Each structure stands twice: as C-alpha cells, then as structure tokens.
Amino acid sequence: MCSKSEQAIVVNDVHAKLNATTMQHCLQPATVAEVITAVTQANKEGCVLSVAGGRHAMGGQQFVTDGVLLDLSRLNKLEHFDPELGQVRVQAGIQWPDLMRKLHVMQYGNSRQWGIRQKQTGADRLSIGGAIAANIHGRGLDMAPFVADIVSLNLVNAQGQLVHCSRQQNAELFRLVVGGYGLFGIVVTATLQLAARQQVVREVELCSLAEMIAALPQRIAAGYLYGDFQFETAPDSAGFLWHGVFSCYRPVATEPIAKQQLRLSKANWQQLLYLAHIDKAEAFSRFSQFYLASNGQRYWSDSHQLSIYLDDYHLALDQQLARGCAGSEMITELYVPLQALQHFMAACAADFRQHKVDLIYGTVRFIRRDAETALAWARQDYACVIFNLHIDHLPEAINTAASHFRRLIDIAIRYQGCYFLTYHPFATKQQVLACYPQFVEFMQQKRRYDPAQRLQSNWYRHYSEMFSEELP
C-alpha cells in the first residue's frame, strides 16, 4: 500500500485548484472495517495517510505529498434516524444533498419533520466528515459553528482503533477532532442533531452596512433564522464593500410553495461569474435585481441552503477572459466583532483600491461563540466576512495574492478579529499566534495522540516546519 507506485496519482482541490499534490495511492473504503484495515496496514508499512471527502478544502489539509489518500466518498450511508429526538447517524462520506434527500424520503407525509440546521453555502457536494474536520458554519443569524450540531462521533484513531467521542466520553478528543482538520483520527460516523423543518419566507432589501448592522438584532429577536449581506464588489462604486443585498429568512406557517418561483439557472450563474470578472457593477446590478424580485418567496428551512456550484466553471471563464493562463478564485474568511465591522470594511475597501485587489464575490455572515473546540475560530461572537479573490495561476500572481491575504489578516487583528486557518497557507507565524494563541498546544496534542504522525497533510507539514522550534 505504501510502496512507491509507478502510477502515482495527482490530486487537487475542486475550487481554487492550487493544491496539485502527488500521492502514491487512493483508497476508497466502503466500510468502517476497511478504514481500520487501511490504518492498520499504514502502521505496519510506515506510510502516512490523509483524508478527503468532497475535495473542496483548499488549504492543503486534505492531501499529503507521497502519502496515501483515504477518499471516504463510498462511506456514505445513513445508518439510523430517530424521529423522536430528531437525530440522525450517518457515515462520514455522505454529502449534504444525499443526506437531505434521504431524510425527505424517510419522513414523507409526516406532520412533524426534521432537517439539517446549517451547512456551508455556495457548494453542496461536501461531506459531513469534512464539515466536522473544519467545524463549518452556514448563514444562521444566531448559531454557533457545526460543533453545536454534533451529538457524538466514532473515529478510527492513528493506531487503528475505533473510538467513540462525545461531550461525555473521550471529551478531550471530541474537542480536538471537531475543527481538527483530520489530524486526530478518521471520523467514520457521526450523530447529528437536526432542527424542526419549517417554511421560511425570504425578505430582501438593498441597504448600507450600517443599516444592516442596526437591523440585525431586531431580526434575531423577531425569530428570523438565516440571513446574509452580499456587498458591492466594484471598487469605483461609492457602495464598494458598504452597500449590499440584505436577505433574511423568517419562519411562516406552512402553505403550498409555488412551483414557478424565480431561481438562477446554471447559465445565469455562469454569466454572473463572467461579469464579476469584467464588469463588477453590472454583476451586482443583475444579482441584486434577481434577489429583490425574489422577495417574498417561500422555501424550506433545510433545502433553501442548497445552491448551484458549477464544477470547473473557470475553464470557460479562462477562455472568455483570454488572459493566457488558468485562473480561479481563492477564498479567505475573516472575523471581527460586529461593532468593529464598519471600520474593518472601510479599511479593506481602502486596501483593495490601493493594491488593485480583484474581488469577485463577498458576503457577511454571523456566528455565535464556540466554547467547545480546541482550535476554535469563533472565539467570540463575530461577523464573518468572506472574500473570493481572483488568482491567475502564475508564481508572481500567487505571491501577490499571498500579500493580499496577509494584509487582510493584519486588518482583522487590528480590529480584535481572526481568520479561518485553512483556506490558504500564507499567514505568518506572528499572525497565527495572534489569532490562535493555543496553536502550539494543538500541535503538541496532535503528537501526543499520534506520536508516529500517521495522519498528516501538507497543511500540517507546513505548520510543523513553521513551529519546529516549539515542537519536539
């Protein structure tokens, strides 16, 4: 399994496509027993393993050079559903659309139904195991990260043993595994707490950042469940990073949902993406017109979180843009206290204009404090600011992007904020420690639970080298 293969494989992430990695083999276990066998064999042969699901992770945490990839996409069953508690046990490779479809079928005709509370937005074919590893969030207005939705999990540790983890059993390991980026064990099953499935109505307005911030507490107090603020991206606009579409979702009594509601087609999305690269003002105009026209439409609280993701959408864009090289969008997510958001966004706008940052898309979401995980990114209640930046796949352009991302982290730190660790590897050591003072302890715990460092990733290797003086 671990010997050098004559036909080594090259894997890459789906979105940024900047993590091409040569690996020796890819295994696709379909049972927990097969995962245990793979880890046991890796220990015998002395090779390293990494774990992937939907392959959207873009910071290097799902691949390891010259290692063996465990692709959990075949470990995808819904094992048990408890309609009384509203809990579901699933295998880690199941992806959101499949989970939601199975829940819908199992509950067809029931007067009380359950659905997922939150998922990542912008893409759907993401695994539950990956959601656990990254401790993801959605667009809930009053929700903590995904750890709040996890009742328990089973993992295969680095020694090949099956271990049950919850807040009551192996609690320290539970805290490390959720948001632990696959370094403390291979999650094979998880029990999730669902929420009552209910209808919501979309309410949309164009407003300023200040108006959105003022309205947010009122929306939460009134029981609105979800929402976000999608801001203008044209740097020559007076509304750049300041004016946007504020969409919220309010629970309503169940009624038949119109079959012909407005929606953006794949062709609409491809056109919007093209405009976002060449005419950002027009892209926002069309996007905001669509959202305003959809005001008042009804959705289900779970399925409204699904979205269209166009696989390899940038191949067509590369031809249209004719820049002579491949390109993609790279994501960063920054967190600041809500009271600092206006100053933070103004500083980002000035920086983007000064450095000619090519911003394609951005949104503001909200998160409640995570007091449970060891490497919590939501160390307090935050506004979450997501920027998608265009990157040409050229060394100079990537170096320029790295500078952009580091400056953004510095701006977040200036306003008592933080950043998400694994969208890119460009943070400095000082930035890591400023935002994650527990990082060295996290890495030390990794080596305590996995002294052979059987489970690795290029992300882990990068930070092991960065913190080599602090680690044994």
Please describe what each predicted stretch is.
Residues 318-319, 406, 413-472:
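Activity-critical C-terminal alpha-helical subdomain
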Residues 2-17:
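N-terminal regions that are enriched for targeting/export leaders
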Residues 83, 127, 157:
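Short, acidic, Ser/Thr-enriched surface-loop or helix-capping motifs
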Residues 151-343, 350:
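C-terminal substrate-binding/cap subdomain adjacent to the FAD-binding core in PCMH-type
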Residues 34-37, 98, 212-213, 240, ...:
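Short, conserved charged micro-motifs
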Residues 304-427, 431-434:
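Substrate-recognition/cap regions that form aromatic- and gly/pro-loop-enriched pockets
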Residues 18-121, 135-140, 364:
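Glycine-rich N-terminal segment of FAD-binding domains in flavoprotein oxidoreductases
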